[in-house]
């Protein structure tokens, strides 16, 4: 957390910006700031370097996809973001071309919110991701027949599947979050994490309130 805040300070404080750019030999400072803001503001979303590249072109800047990838790698090296890949059931490996980016400090998104329009859903997913990493899990995206499960989590021989939602009080939201679970067998635990106080556990899915999840040593 302290390293993240320090890097943010160096990146965006006018008096210290030279330190960060000097270490990474970045010459296109304005372009770098644009990419940083875009990436940190779009956490917990499907990511590709091409999508960032297209955004930059649309903003009127010119650069190469390699430049975008290099800048994103700098953010990873500075522990500002973490990238996870999709787990493939067919080839039993990660799909290197498909993934999401998560902010190591979720406030990196909030301080960039437009007119205080905080992105609660994606930030909540980001918070759960950070906590799963802290609890020692290897975390991957999971897709089964076109239905996305937020996280496939593995630690030693333990595998769990996790869905995250702000609330499932609405029936359509509940059905959307639970549908992917119904396509899995029951050999591994399935967990739904929300802010709801009501217990939505079923015979095959365990519901955990967010606050309790954050206070647990493990799941």
Question: Where are the regions that the model predicts?
Answer:
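Accessory nucleic acid-recognition modules appended to NTPase machines
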Residues: 4-156
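Domain-level recognition of nuclease-like catalytic cores that cleave nucleotide substrates
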Residues: 197-219
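Active-site ExK catalytic segment of metal-dependent nucleases
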Residues: 158-170, 177
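Hydrophobic, well-ordered secondary-structure elements that form the walls
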Residues: 132, 162, 181, 190
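Nucleic-acid nuclease catalytic cores
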Residues: 144, 185-204
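Short active-site-adjacent structural elements
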Residues: 149-150, 170-173, 199-202
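Hydrophobic/aromatic beta-strand patches that form the interior of the parallel beta-sheet core
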Residues: 102, 162, 191-193, 206-208
């Amino acid at each position: 957390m302290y390293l993240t805040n320090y890097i943010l300070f160096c990146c965006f404080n006018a008096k210290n910006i030279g330190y960060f750019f000097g270490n990474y030999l970045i010459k296109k400072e304005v372009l770098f700031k644009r990419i940083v803001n875009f990436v940190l503001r779009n956490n917990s979303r499907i990511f590709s370097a091409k999508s960032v590249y297209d955004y930059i072109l649309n903003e009127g800047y010119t650069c190469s996809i390699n430049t975008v990838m290099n800048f994103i790698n700098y953010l990873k090296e500075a522990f500002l973001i973490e990238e996870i890949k999709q787990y493939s059931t067919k080839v039993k490996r990660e799909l290197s071309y498909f993934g999401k980016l998560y902010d190591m400090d979720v406030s990196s998104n909030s301080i960039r919110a437009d007119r205080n329009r905080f992105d609660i859903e994606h930030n909540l997913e980001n918070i759960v991701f950070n906590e799963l990493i802290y609890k020692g899990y290897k975390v991957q995206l999971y897709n089964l027949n076109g239905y996305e499960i937020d996280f496939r989590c593995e630690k030693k021989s333990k595998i769990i599947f996790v869905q995250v939602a702000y609330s499932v009080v609405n029936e359509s939201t509940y059905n959307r979050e639970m549908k992917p679970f119904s396509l899995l067998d029951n050999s591994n635990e399935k967990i739904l994490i929300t802010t709801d106080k009501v217990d939505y556990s079923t015979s095959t899915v365990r519901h955990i309130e967010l606050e309790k999840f954050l206070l647990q040593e493990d799941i």
